[in-house]
Amino acid sequence: MKTSLISGERFYSLEESNLVKEIFKKAVKIFEAFGYDYINLSHFEPYEFQELTFGEGSKEAITFKDSYTKESFGLRLDFTTQVVRTISHLRNVKLPERVYYFGKVFSLDRRGFEKLQTGVELIGEKSILADFEVIQVLTEFLKSLGLKDLKVILSHAGIVRKVADEREELLRAFSERNLEALKEVLGNDIKFFVEVSKNPEVLNFLEKYDLEKEKEELLELGKLLEEFGIDYAYDLGEVRNFPYYTGVIFEIYELKSGKALAGGGRYDNLSKIYGKEYPATGGAVYLERLLDILPKNVEKKDYFVIDKTKKRLGLKLADVLREKGKKVGMEIVKERGLEHSLIYAFDKGFKEVLLVEDEIVKVYTTPKDYVVMKIREFLDLIE
């Protein structure tokens, strides 16, 4: 039989889906604590702008053509570009704009056509304090998920671009960490591009390449991170995949797993595509990687009600409990025996099962253990 799965598609289990929901709730709490507003974004982008933004990378876009207008458009490849496009078309923009998002990006990556992300963008401010804020927000968010052993890896888009002199083969060598190809060009200087160090002296060699501005920005950002207790190091050979970055770039690693869980940087020229001049910085969290390392559980719900009364007292009890803010499910499978109903309820994450018989309710805390009380007595115990 032919499979109904699409190559590159991912299904999420109920446990994974519950974790995604909990991650989103944490994201809302942390991002809004820093003054960020939620922005709901289109799934689509004009393909001509994807070509302008991503260059060769636009070939990874999943594209469509409107049979009526003949316009080509693609599913969004990236949230940053979609945020900038949206902000550039909004009226009454008050700079700086702080926004956060949550959803999927799409590409023809065979490892997965769709990837979940959340993140923040700070539009309209060019200071290093803005870059620091984005890193601080994302770090606090990851910590709120119980991830404590984090390290921020810093670099600057201008470094590799200047050293490679915009040569495509050298940019590719940096991206692929091709040490042989890099050594042919850099000689002994290659050691500065492969060393990961917190020591600010690693930045001194940048003056040799007339990169004093990049050096000062990285030094200033490092001091801010140090002051606020955020662990960091410099990796001057770091390259971000998207070509629109212009300034500080970063990745946030969880050291136990060795995974980069978030990344981003400054992109001061991106809004020019849409006729604006908004300096900006931002970063995204890669939720697929979070799903790999965070514990996944069935969502806990409060009560599962089994109604054995002719007057539907169980249904009425369930409504009363929901009005009190409880999460309540009902047994609707008439043919199922009590034992199987109890097993089902506890397997689905219900904390207690309520078997309602006339004015009496049996409160099960396990498939075997219960107490008996009147319905009114039970309700008096509920907060």
UniProtKB/Swiss-Prot annotation:
Source superkingdom: Bacteria
Pathway linked to the protein: Amino-acid biosynthesis; L-histidine biosynthesis; L-histidine from 5-phospho-alpha-D-ribose 1-diphosphate: step 1/9
Assigned keywords, A-Z: Amino-acid biosynthesis, Cytoplasm, Histidine biosynthesis
Disulfide pairings: none
MF terms in GO: histidine-tRNA ligase activity
GO biological process terms held by the UniProt record: histidyl-tRNA aminoacylation; L-histidine biosynthetic process
Classification via Gene3D superfamilies: Bira Bifunctional Protein, Domain 2 (3.30.930.10)
Cell compartments where the protein resides: Cytoplasm
GO CC, alphabetical: cytoplasm
Ranges in a coiled coil: none
Function, as annotated: Required for the first step of histidine biosynthesis. May allow the feedback regulation of ATP phosphoribosyltransferase activity by histidine.
Miscellaneous comment as given in the Swiss-Prot or TrEMBL entry: This function is generally fulfilled by the C-terminal part of HisG, which is missing in some bacteria such as this one.
Similarity annotation: Belongs to the class-II aminoacyl-tRNA synthetase family. HisZ subfamily.
HAMAP family according to UniProt: HisZ (MF_00125)
Complex formation: Heteromultimer composed of HisG and HisZ subunits.
Protein name stated in the entry: ATP phosphoribosyltransferase regulatory subunit
